[in-house]
């Protein structure tokens, strides 16, 4: 039986989440509210909300947990070529927290294979925008010729980043944003990005699963640390690609 949380009820221990033999492995609790205070409590415990319109708020803590260690991020030759182009061409920008709500809306509208509708509801957008205003949620955005073409958003506490969703309106646009985030987190010495659940796309970029017990222990330590700065731009990509190449003469494609 999944417990129902009233406004003042704490989360149960994550070990009580439903197991793999159930139809909803990782489901921990349900509630009627998505208050910012509840959302903060969830992230500090390694719990996240995931539900659809018409459902109660469902809270999850899966075992195992998908994570991406910035030090293990895989840059393919084609992505490295793209990142070098981003570095050398002024038309490319990576902006941080420029249009947080816009990124969330774009993620909500992005088609997902095997999914109908979106879990990024108006209620979710309002709740995470509240975290953004308090400095605990961030967007990393890929811009080209003054137009936002991809990005991602997530939650940050201390030295922990919890990835939420990403989208791309152009090839590699979300990967550019992720690579820029990874480069910044490497620079700051962060050890882990929470990716919640396993996907082949994340695995191809270096993501892997770890036991929930290890994940929660890391979260407990990391969120207690002082927060990192969140001002950076595409120049951090040089750590992943080497120095930017000089611009090619007009009409020549590298």
Curated annotation (Swiss-Prot):
Which Gene Ontology terms describe the biological processes this protein takes part in? protein catabolic process
Catalyzed reaction equations: N-terminal L-lysyl-[protein] + L-leucyl-tRNA(Leu) = N-terminal L-leucyl-L-lysyl-[protein] + tRNA(Leu) + H(+); N-terminal L-arginyl-[protein] + L-leucyl-tRNA(Leu) = N-terminal L-leucyl-L-arginyl-[protein] + tRNA(Leu) + H(+); L-phenylalanyl-tRNA(Phe) + an N-terminal L-alpha-aminoacyl-[protein] = an N-terminal L-phenylalanyl-L-alpha-aminoacyl-[protein] + tRNA(Phe)
**Transmembrane stretches, start-end:** none
Q: Which GO terms describe its cellular component?
A: cytoplasm
Instruction: Give the matching InterPro entries.
Output: Acyl_CoA_acyltransferase (IPR016181), Leu/Phe-tRNA_Trfase (IPR004616), Leu/Phe-tRNA_Trfase_C (IPR042203), Leu/Phe-tRNA_Trfase_N (IPR042221)
Kindly report the protein's main subcellular placement as a broad class: cytoplasm
Q: What Pfam families does the database record attribute to this sequence? A: Leu_Phe_trans
Instruction: Name residues in a coiled coil.
Output: none
- Quote the Gene3D superfamilies the UniProt record gives: Leucyl/phenylalanyl-tRNA-protein transferase, C-terminal domain, Leucyl/phenylalanyl-tRNA-protein transferase, N-terminal domain
Q: What Enzyme Commission number(s) apply to this enzyme? A: 2.3.2.6
Alphabetically ordered keywords of this record: Acyltransferase, Cytoplasm, Transferase
> Which family, according to UniProt?
Belongs to the L/F-transferase family.
Report the protein's function. Functions in the N-end rule pathway of protein degradation where it conjugates Leu, Phe and, less efficiently, Met from aminoacyl-tRNAs to the N-termini of proteins containing an N-terminal arginine or lysine.
Provide the protein name. Answer: Leucyl/phenylalanyl-tRNA--protein transferase
């Amino acid at each position: 039986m999944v417990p129902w949380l009233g406004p003042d009820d704490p989360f149960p221990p994550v070990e009580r989440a439903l197991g793999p033999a159930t139809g909803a492995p990782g489901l921990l609790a349900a509630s009627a509210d998505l208050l910012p205070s509840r959302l903060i409590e969830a992230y500090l415990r390694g719990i996240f909300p995931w539900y659809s319109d018409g459902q109660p708020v469902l809270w999850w803590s899966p075992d195992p947990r998908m994570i991406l260690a910035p030090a293990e991020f895989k840059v393919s030759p084609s992505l490295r070529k793209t990142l070098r182009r981003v570095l050398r061409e002024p038309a490319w920008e990576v902006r941080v927290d420029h249009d947080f709500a816009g990124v969330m809306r774009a993620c909500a509208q992005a088609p997902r294979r095997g999914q109908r509708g979106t879990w990024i509801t108006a209620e979710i957008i309002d709740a995470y925008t509240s975290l953004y205003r308090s400095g605990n949620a961030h967007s990393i955005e890929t811009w080209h010729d003054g137009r936002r073409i991809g990005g991602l958003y997530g939650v940050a506490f201390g030295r922990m980043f919890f990835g939420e969703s990403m989208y791309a309106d152009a090839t590699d646009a979300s990967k550019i944003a992720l690579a820029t985030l990874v480069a910044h987190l490497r620079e700051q010495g962060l050890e882990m990005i929470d990716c919640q659940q396993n996907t082949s796309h994340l695995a191809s970029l270096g993501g892997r699963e770890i036991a929930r017990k290890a994940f929660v222990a890391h979260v407990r330590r990391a969120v207690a640390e002082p927060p990192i700065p969140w001002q950076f731009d595409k120049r951090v990509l040089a750590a992943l690609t080497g120095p930017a190449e000089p611009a090619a003469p007009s009409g020549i494609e590298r």
